[in-house]
Each structure stands twice: as C-alpha cells, then as structure tokens.
Amino acid sequence: MVAALALAGCRHDSFTIEGTIEGGANQTVWLEELAPDGPIFIDSIPLDGQGCFSYTYRMPYRSFYNLHTTADNYIVTLPDYGETVDVHGRWDNLSLSYTVEGSPESVLLWQLQQYTNEGARLLADLVDTTNHYQQLLQDGKVSQAAVDAKKRFTDSLYRDERDRQREYVYDFVDQNRGSLSTLIALYKTFNDRALINPRDSVGEQCYRTVREGLQERYPDNPHTRHFAQ
C-alpha cells in the first residue's frame, strides 16, 4: 500500500516534503509522482490548524513530485534522496505564490516557473491592452488607425517576450545539463505554444543536450529511457 511507503527516517531512499500553506488551515493537499507515462497519485496530506504539513516518501527512483491544492493549482518538485523540500505558499494560488528551499533541483524548477509566470503576466497585460483598444474603437473614442498602431506595438512586445522565454530555456538547458529539470524546461510553452521546436536546428541541439546529459548522469532512470524512445 502507498501508506507503507511513507516511512519517516529512511533518509537514504526517501525525501520529506513539508511547509506551510497560508489560508489552508485544516485543508488537504495531495502528492503525486509525475512519472514518465503520466501522473500517479501517492497520498493525501492533511494540513493542521496553521496550514502546516510534513510527509516522507520512499522514492523508487529520482522523479518529479507534484503537490496539489486543487487539480489545476500545483507545484512541481524534484527532490533528491535525503532532502527535505520546504514549501511555502498561498492556498488559493500556490503555483504563483510558492517558494521552495532545501532541494537544489526543486529550486531550479521554481526559478524556471518564475520566469514562465513573468511571461504569462506580460501576455495577460497585452491581451488586456488589445481588448481595451477594441472597446475604445467600438465606443468611437479612437480610430481604426490608432488600434492598428497599438496592435503593431503589442505584437512586437509579444514576439520579444516569446524570444526571451525561448532563450531562457536554451540557457537553462545548457547550464543544467544532466539535470532532470531540463525535461520540464524542454516542454515549456508561451501562449500555449511550444517554445522549443525539435525540428529546427537550435531546437534539435537543445533536445540532444537534454538527452545526452541525462544518459550520462542517469542512464537507468525511467525518465531518461522514456525520453530516449
């Protein structure tokens, strides 16, 4: 049973995830593994009256572990054996508010997510600006020429941010070669579109860097084998 895997003190083959979720007093979070073939539920974890929790899990291999408050509100961690992943955030918006300590590769994923969040905020601002000018046009307060000029400007900002997000992923993969975190970076999106295209030369090299780095460091890891297929 899953519960049998939650054994405190097995430092050599387990990790602990703990922390405080503000606004989550007496609620329940859940932990799942993001396995090569998809998510696998591990266990529900109750929060106490202060929103605090602690849970120890025996890992069969290095993998990603998602902590959920709801189906769509979660964070991704990448613990190593013996680590205590210390998480803090808000219940209503964990994915945007969380911080993490005690696990270097979980911190890498946090940094990656922070950059993604910045891009998402800019994208939302651009959409709001576009909608605002469309409403002004309908109200007769601006001309079509003004709307077109604003669209050219926001389109330029969009392309610049998309390119920055892409360059960040390239740099992340290069600087963290051999880390499983590069798998998450590889599939990052901007405006629901993949940033890395394995069919162009730069994207192909990025995929190769991830594949070769993982084969060197984690040749027997299921994530490495799955990615190499």
Listing of model-derived features with the role each one plays in the protein:
Residues 201-229:
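N-proximal helix/coil linker or "cap" segments that precede and/or mark the start of modular domains
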Residues 156, 194-203:
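Short coil/turn connectors between adjacent alpha-helices in alpha-solenoid helical repeat scaffolds
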Residues 168, 188, 209-213:
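A general alpha-helix detector
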Residues 178-193:
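Amphipathic alpha-helical repeat scaffolds of TPR domains
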Residues 10-167, 172:
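A non-transmembrane, solvent-exposed segment enriched in polar/low-complexity residues
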Residues 1-8:
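Sec-dependent bacterial lipoprotein signal peptides
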